């Protein structure tokens, strides 16, 4: 208990009298952020992949940036999309024929989190030139969410 008080004191001692600073929650917030750091991707996660390589990931990211711009999405959406992809690839292997599906499903998830008007699933099938149907996108969305334990965001630095 003493350590918690010391952390709160050290972090927010200048704001301890400000009710808007909600210093009572500092310890809980820092614990949450420390726990969330554990969800970051492994550093060398691409070495774990057997059917894809870093160049393929780069091509996917370039394509997603183009899609992001075409749909006029917010900057945080593309950042979250890439973070979701990296966290998923850090935990699961994927076949190269599913990599674009992973990307579009991650964009779909991120856009629902960040955008006021996210694209519809039909837009996701359209941008893949109908390589995947709506059910494929929705199934991959659920696969990703389950793998990430429904934790969409994690610290990125």
Where are the model-predicted features located?
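Acidic, Ser/Thr/Pro-rich regulatory low-complexity segments at or just upstream of the first helical elements
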Residues: 1-101, 110-157
């Amino acid at each position: 208990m003493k350590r918690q008080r010391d952390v709160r004191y050290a972090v927010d001692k200048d704001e301890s009298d400000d009710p808007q600073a909600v210093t009572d929650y500092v310890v809980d917030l820092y614990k949450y952020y420390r726990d969330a750091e554990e969800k970051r991707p492994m550093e060398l996660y691409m070495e774990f992949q057997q059917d894809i390589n870093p160049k393929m990931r780069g091509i996917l990211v370039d394509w997603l940036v183009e899609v992001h711009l075409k749909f006029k999405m917010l900057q945080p959406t593309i950042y979250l999309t890439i973070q979701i992809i990296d966290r998923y690839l850090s935990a699961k292997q994927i076949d190269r024929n599913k990599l674009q599906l992973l990307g579009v499903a991650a964009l779909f998830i991120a856009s629902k989190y960040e955008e006021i008007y996210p694209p519809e699933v039909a837009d996701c099938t359209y941008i893949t030139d109908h390589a995947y149907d709506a059910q494929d996108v929705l199934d991959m969305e659920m696969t990703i969410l389950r793998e990430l334990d429904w934790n969409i965001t994690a610290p990125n630095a």
